[in-house]
Amino acid sequence: MQRSIFARFGNSSAAVSTLNRLSTTAAPHAKNGYATATGAGAAAATATASSTHAAAAAAAAANHSTQESGFDYEGLIDSELQKKRLDKSYRYFNNINRLAKEFPLAHRQREADKVTVWCSNDYLALSKHPEVLDAMHKTIDKYGCGAGGTRNIAGHNIPTLNLEAELATLHKKEGALVFSSCYVANDAVLSLLGQKMKDLVIFSDELNHASMIVGIKHANVKKHIFKHNDLNELEQLLQSYPKSVPKLIAFESVYSMAGSVADIEKICDLADKYGALTFLDEVHAVGLYGPHGAGVAEHCDFESHRASGIATPKTNDKGGAKTVMDRVDMITGTLGKSFGSVGGYVAASRKLIDWFRSFAPGFIFTTTLPPSVMAGATAAIRYQRCHIDLRTSQQKHTMYVKKAFHELGIPVIPNPSHIVPVLIGNADLAKQASDILINKHQIYVQAINFPTVARGTERLRITPTPGHTNDLSDILINAVDDVFNELQLPRVRDWESQGGLLGVGESGFVEESNLWTSSQLSLTNDDLNPNVRDPIVKQLEVSSGIKQ
């Protein structure tokens, strides 16, 4: 896999110049929480932010010294909120009520005001699928609404056991553990690893999700942040430590705001070479990649997994003993995106799962998800596993939109995944574009601003699903083109004249091929191993506790 476009941007003086010209404020990529400033514009933004914080602190201190009643809490809160309004990062939530029987439609405050949703993470529309809803209805009728407490106090139940067995089977691991969300799963697992391995050194991709950043912070161990997808820098950092020092490489498969993809196999090679564990977040990949929807790690050995079905392949696609998915030590995922439900999980070895179950506070002290939620997620996983057509149609719809945008000069940050990030480059304009789409064209696409992405890289994030037909796509494409004309937003040629940014309009930039090959996209459900249809999946002992 080629070197990251983000690494190239970070080292490019032309890109820094572009940020200074096309954005009122350039800043380090703020999603990671550790980022260092890039270029003069970023330094200026950092200085401005520092002075603003200093002024707010001084005002708070003055209030504290003059008011007998004590600290001016409301003054501090007002100051922080005002800063967000001034830098255009203050967020307004739209009232969007997605309709179960009219996907991808939703209504706003008034039921008559309908819009087409183009930015949902319900990637496969399984939250509305009849089999999923039926499983939830039956379970709630039988077991009620809530779980009654934590698993430690209230015990767990058959839906929980079934779900964890399905997740372990999906990722071909010995066990899985369900959490209330993947944010909690990432935080709980990463923090526990650091708390129990005091000499652990964590190597984290700079674009990792906030949940991973928080987990690494809570781990309270030494950490290194490497440039996004820059494996040369990662290796340099790894080789600076003896092999005897415990290490962990934390990364994602698909990075949600730009659609970039990690080279999982090469990261596993580095982990083997330098004695590191691997922690892979597949949140934006499960359901969408691999013959059975286990994610990008499964996709790396696509044919071996397709042929073996739910069984573990005897060899990988290159004839080796282990698949890439087998080589990854810990895989976290979500039930709340492609699987249409809510919750998160980790899949790993039997011993690791028992360890997390026994020691992770984020698991021990959190009320268990409702039985109906567990049952719905299980139904979704089972359905999507044997329906590769969901994945192929989603990919085809994504390609259709990307191709049309390319022909119109609409700037899409290039990537090999299912994400369609339309570069705007200005927070205020991104919100205006989103507002025009929903109010004039009845299309809902949320603007993505700081701190989710860096200032100067604001965007519209579009996510086609199997339900977004070409007819709906044509309406979207025409609407976005209209918005670009109305707001005079920069197109590819405009970015190119300024030196390019994030792969848009960059001279000599070579875009990566889509993860799905043409032969993979031509597969049908009948091309899958029959053992994926209604398999008997046994409950796991580790879910309840291992008896000695």
From Swiss-Prot:
InterPro entries per UniProt: 4pyrrol_synth_NH2levulA_synth, Aminotrans_II_pyridoxalP_BS, Aminotransferase_I/II_large, AON_synthase_class-II, PyrdxlP-dep_Trfase, PyrdxlP-dep_Trfase_major, PyrdxlP-dep_Trfase_small
Named cofactor requirement(s): pyridoxal 5'-phosphate
Modified residues (N6-(pyridoxal phosphate)lysine): 337
Effect of residue 275 to R: Lethal in combination with a MCX1 disruption
SUPFAM superfamilies with a match to the protein in the record: PLP-dependent transferases
Known role: Catalyzes the synthesis of 5-aminolevulinate (ALA) from succinyl-CoA and glycine, the first and rate-limiting step in heme biosynthesis.
Additional remark text: Present with 22600 molecules/cell in log phase SD medium.
Protein name, UniProt field: 5-aminolevulinate synthase, mitochondrial
The species this protein was found in: Saccharomyces cerevisiae (strain ATCC 204508 / S288c)
Lineage: Eukaryota, Fungi, Dikarya, Ascomycota, Saccharomycotina
